[in-house]
Amino acid sequence: MLIRLLLLVICLAGPGVAEEIRIKDLVRFDGVRGNDLLGYGLVVGLNGTGDGLRNAPFTEDIMSNLLERLGVNVTGEQYRPKNVAAVFVTATLPPFARAGAQIDVTVSAMGDAKSLLGGTLVMTPLNGADGQIYAVAQGTIIAGGVSAEGQAARVVQGVPTAGTIPEGARVEREVEFEFARLDRVRLALRSPDFTTAGRIEDRINRELGRGVATMLDAGTVSLDLGRLGPPARVMGRIENLEVVPETVARVVVDQRSGTIVMGEDVRISRVAVAQGGLTLRVEEQPMVVQPNPFSRGETVVVPRTTASIQQRPGTGLAEIPAETSLSRVVAGLNALGVAPNDMIDILKSIHAAGALHAEFIVR
């Protein structure tokens, strides 16, 4: 199967022109973060695609506990519905979220349910790492796939055993954080870089005065807010200031999907590339051999192997000049007429030869 190739070229507005980015898009406020929430509950209303209670006994326990809380006595009763599934529910409580705010949740099957499509999550408390309940989730699930089956076949597209509920949880408890009392805040860069951190320091000091911002390292800029007024107002001014971030030459390769992403600053030294195009094919076709009549012989299966080697016409040796930009790299690889999966191997080889001057990430 051919590996699909998606080559994304990140181009700037014009040659030699760098774009200014807001500081809020380059950093996060140290200590201001979301909190993960987790709960487990029941999804009801499934069209016969729920848990098989023999294989997922915890579903019956969860259902019994829920019905007992609602005043329904189920002690000693045996019931095996197919429209119920036990699920894990996860969400992230954003910073500064107030009671009554609604947040998105993700629902994932715990047992052997075939699909959560069309199901409804019933009231499920969501706990934080401290064991306290911070939100309650409930709503109709939007599944990410679909499945259909008959007596002898089943077709599945996507992942029908997981889904989301947009704004499916309501915040019940707030995380206390007194931002207004802070007199010092640290900015944490999303992509640490000394040059970018220095530019952020210079830009803030030009706007608010010398000594307000101090670069501590490649990933941290400290702010002294004590003499500038209310911290929220000051941070509102700072986060909308713009700087030019330093870009890093980077190539990211995803071997599973055949995706290659390269930034504009990728350069390579002078190098020659040849691509082989050798294909080896081995097939096994077992053959049944019957004995002669009345020979008392046995029927046996004889292995039969067919092997072949195919060599595509050579594309020759292609030379890529020194200090070649991204566009020339793409043109050079396309000139070889290589397949997408071969292009990934060529990039690996160029990097191994020391000619690709960029961070090379393989996933």
UniProtKB/Swiss-Prot annotation:
Molecular functions per Gene Ontology: structural molecule activity
GO biological process: bacterial-type flagellum-dependent cell motility
Protein name: Flagellar P-ring protein 2
Signal peptide as annotated in the record: 1-18
Keyword match Cell cycle: no
Superkingdom: Bacteria
Function as written in the Swiss-Prot or TrEMBL entry: Assembles around the rod to form the L-ring and probably protects the motor/basal body from shearing forces during rotation.
Subunit structure: The basal body constitutes a major portion of the flagellar organelle and consists of four rings (L,P,S, and M) mounted on a central rod.
This protein's encoding gene: flgI2
NCBIfam families (alphabetical): PRK05303.1
Principal location class: periplasm
Cross-referenced PANTHER family: FLAGELLAR P-RING PERIPLASMIC PROTEIN FLGI (PTHR30381), FLAGELLAR P-RING PROTEIN (PTHR30381:SF0)
Organism the protein comes from: Cereibacter sphaeroides (strain ATCC 17023 / DSM 158 / JCM 6121 / CCUG 31486 / LMG 2827 / NBRC 12203 / NCIMB 8253 / ATH 2.4.1.)
Gene Ontology CC entries for this record: bacterial-type flagellum basal body, distal rod, P ring; outer membrane-bounded periplasmic space
InterPro entries (alphabetical): Flag_FlgI (IPR001782)
Cellular localization per UniProt: Periplasm; Bacterial flagellum basal body
Matches recorded under HAMAP family: FlgI
Keywords for the protein's UniProt record, in alphabetical order: Bacterial flagellum, Periplasm, Signal
UniProt record similarity statement: Belongs to the FlgI family.
